[in-house]
């Protein structure tokens, strides 16, 4: 994994905050399988997210 990919792996894909050490969910994109991370606040508020690889959007 590149340094850029590692940075993105520890950021909420919805709001961009650093999620290291926080309650967060990490899951695979339903379309392409890319790992996506979201903070608990964005999950609770059902904020939209977009997969950085394929553009899939979900709640």
Curated annotation (Swiss-Prot):
UniProt key word Repeat: no
One record GO biological process: single-species surface biofilm formation
Documented effect of changing residue 34 to A: Not able to complement the deletion mutant of this gene. Loss of swarming. Severe loss of structure and stability
Motif (C(P)XCG motif 4): 51-55
Highest taxon above the source species: Archaea
Disruption phenotype: Cells lacking this gene grow as the wild-type in complex medium and in synthetic medium with glucose as sole carbon and energy source, but the mutant cells are not capable of swarming and have severe defects in forming biofilms. In this mutant many motility and chemotaxis genes are down-regulated, and several genes likely involved in sugar import, sugar metabolism and glycoprotein production are up-regulated.
Role this protein plays: Zinc-binding protein that binds only one zinc ion. Is required for swarming and biofilm formation.
Protein name (Swiss-Prot/TrEMBL): Zinc finger protein HVO_2753
Lineage, highest ranks first: Archaea, Methanobacteriati, Methanobacteriota, Stenosarchaea group, Halobacteria
């Amino acid at each position: 994994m590149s340094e850029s990919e590692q940075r993105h792996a520890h950021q909420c894909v919805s709001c961009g905050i650093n999620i290291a050490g926080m309650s967060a969910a990490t899951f695979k994109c339903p379309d392409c399988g890319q790992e996506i991370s979201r903070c608990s606040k964005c999950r609770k508020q059902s904020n939209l997210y977009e997969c950085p690889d394929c553009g899939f959007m979900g709640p």
